[in-house]
Amino acid sequence: MAKDDVIQMQGEVLENLPNATFRVKLENGHIVLGHISGKMRMNYIRILPGDKVTVELTPYDLSRARIVFRTK
C-alpha cells in the first residue's frame, strides 16, 4: 500500500481492548478500532484512555485505523 492512500485524522482514545487494540473516537464523531503501529510498539509508547492520538485510515476499510502518534 502506498503512503498516498492513507487518511490521517485526529482522535481520542475511549477504551483499551485486548491485544494492543483501542477504541478511538475521531474528530468527526466516528468510532473506529485502532491498533498501535510497529514503531510505537518498539519504543514502548503507552496509550491510555483519554489520550489524543493521530490515526491513519485506509480507503479500503474505514472502521479500522493505525495509531501512529500520541500527543501530550
Curated annotation (Swiss-Prot):
> Which GO CC annotations does the UniProt entry carry?
cytosol
Q: Which InterPro entries match?
A: NA-bd_OB-fold (IPR012340), RNA-binding_domain_S1_IF1 (IPR006196), S1_domain (IPR003029), TIF_IF1 (IPR004368)
Domain S1-like: start-end pairs: 1-72
What SUPFAM superfamilies would the database entry show?
A: Nucleic acid-binding proteins
Query: Which keywords does UniProt give here?
Result: Cytoplasm, Initiation factor, Protein biosynthesis, RNA-binding, rRNA-binding
- Which Gene Ontology molecular function entries are recorded, alphabetically? ribosome binding; rRNA binding; translation initiation factor activity
Where in the cell is the protein located?
A: Cytoplasm
Work out whether the entry's keyword set contains Cytoplasm: yes
Keyword rRNA-binding applies = yes
Q: Out of the domains of life, which is the source?
A: Bacteria
Main localization category:
cytoplasm
Q: Per its database record, what is this protein's job?
A: One of the essential components for the initiation of protein synthesis. Stabilizes the binding of IF-2 and IF-3 on the 30S subunit to which N-formylmethionyl-tRNA(fMet) subsequently binds. Helps modulate mRNA selection, yielding the 30S pre-initiation complex (PIC). Upon addition of the 50S ribosomal subunit IF-1, IF-2 and IF-3 are released leaving the mature 70S translation initiation complex.
User: What family does the Swiss-Prot or TrEMBL record give for this protein?
Assistant: Belongs to the IF-1 family.
Task: Report quaternary structure and partners.
Answer: Component of the 30S ribosomal translation pre-initiation complex which assembles on the 30S ribosome in the order IF-2 and IF-3, IF-1 and N-formylmethionyl-tRNA(fMet); mRNA recruitment can occur at any time during PIC assembly.
**What is this protein's record name?**
Translation initiation factor IF-1 2
Where does this protein come from, organism-wise?
A: Cupriavidus metallidurans (strain ATCC 43123 / DSM 2839 / NBRC 102507 / CH34) (Ralstonia metallidurans)
